[in-house]
């Protein structure tokens, strides 16, 4: 994720961003994630979450990682009961899920009701833009 985009998120008064994570905290969380046997996530996801641990804007949310503020939903908690080996839910808005599909190796917006793919991209930055409707 570009530094300009992180600055844009942090400097926008309407967007709530979680704090950056210390590298030791991030390593521990990734270990816990791996131990939860969830589908693997790409590096750009982890790099972003280390800089901006959760994002909320206008009814949309990108999940954080075990945020002490409890403002953001936790990635592991949100995915533990899904029982899917190739998709991880990363966030949501009122009508769509933001997921990473490991088979396609793409971030996708999926309609909550119809479960159809509405948008697909290779970068987490583009996916954030789309789910938050920026």
Label every PLM stretch briefly.
Residues 1-99:
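A surface-exposed partner-binding patch
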Residues 48, 107, 123:
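Functionally constrained cores in energy, signaling, and assembly domains
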Residues 95, 104-105:
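Short glycine/proline-enriched coil/turn segments at helix->beta-strand junctions
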Residues 94, 114-116:
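Residue-level detector of flexible, active-site-proximal loop/helix-junction positions
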Residues 116-134:
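Compact, glycine/acidic-enriched structural inserts
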Residues 105-112:
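Short aromatic-glycine-(Arg/Gly/Cys) micro-motifs in beta-strand/loop hairpins
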Residues 98-100, 109, 118-119:
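Short helix/loop capping segments that flank catalytic or ligand/cofactor-binding pockets
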């Amino acid at each position: 994720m570009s530094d300009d985009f992180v600055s844009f998120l942090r400097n926008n008064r309407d967007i709530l961003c979680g704090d950056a994570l210390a590298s030791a905290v991030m390593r521990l969380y990734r270990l816990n994630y791996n131990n939860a046997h969830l589908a693997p996530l790409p590096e750009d996801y982890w790099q972003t979450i280390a800089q901006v641990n959760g994002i909320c804007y206008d009814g949309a949310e990108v999940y954080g990682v075990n945020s002490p503020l409890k403002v953001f939903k936790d990635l592991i908690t949100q995915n533990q009961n899904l029982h899917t080996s190739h998709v991880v839910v990363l966030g949501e808005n009122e009508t769509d899920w933001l997921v990473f599909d490991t088979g396609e190796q793409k971030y996708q917006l999926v309609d909550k009701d119809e479960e159809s793919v509405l948008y697909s991209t290779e970068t987490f930055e583009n996916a954030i833009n789309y789910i938050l409707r920026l």
